[in-house]
Amino acid sequence: MDPRGKRDKHRALLDAKLTELALFAKQLCPAASVEASTIRYEDEDGRVEVFPPPGIWEAEEERIELALAARSAQIFDETGLYIVCAVLDPTAR
């Protein structure tokens, strides 16, 4: 396979997994704002940032973060894609 075809295949897989994680985040917290990005930092392939609504309980925030981290780890094991997921303070946007 030519290098461009390999790169296109990698990008298509990355886009699919970012979409999967973003949809999963919305399932976990429908009221959250979710942003997915392919901007690379260091060794990561992409990132998903979740901004829950103000006033969410800390335990709920942690539940969302742990579920996303587990799914991201599973994706890494299956594909080698390193996608960072974070639940962030909505006022920090």
Place the predicted regions along the sequence by residue.
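Generic "edge-of-domain/loop-turn" microfeature
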Residues: Y41, G55-W57, A92
